[in-house]
Amino acid sequence: MPGKTRYDDTLAVILSELSRTWARGKDQSTPEGWQYPDDHFNYTSVILTGGNTAPNRQIGGFDLDPAVKGQAVAILDESGTVVKRVPTAADLVATVCGAFGMKMGTDFFIPGGHGQIQDAITM
């Protein structure tokens, strides 16, 4: 449904990657000794505004303990089940695609699993 202003029809996404993790392993003298972690989006903040975003909401949170990977939120996964887990970058992309009216598994596919973050987008 079209909004009343251009702002209502425009989704702005501000994404900040705040750190990276280093490759680690027991013996890094050979390629087999390396373990490559997911070195992007270790800590990320995201702001969604305009479009179909739900107003005045903070979803998730943070912890100053570097061992904490984020706070679990409700996510509608690919199977249609609502699960509670820490969101990933793929979940953010799926949520943005959902705001554009795209359907998971039909209009787009993200390898490795993803879900739409609940309560971020109003429809």
Predicted regions: what they are:
Residues 1-123:
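Feature marks hydrolase-like catalytic cores characterized by long aromatic- and Gly/Pro-rich stretches
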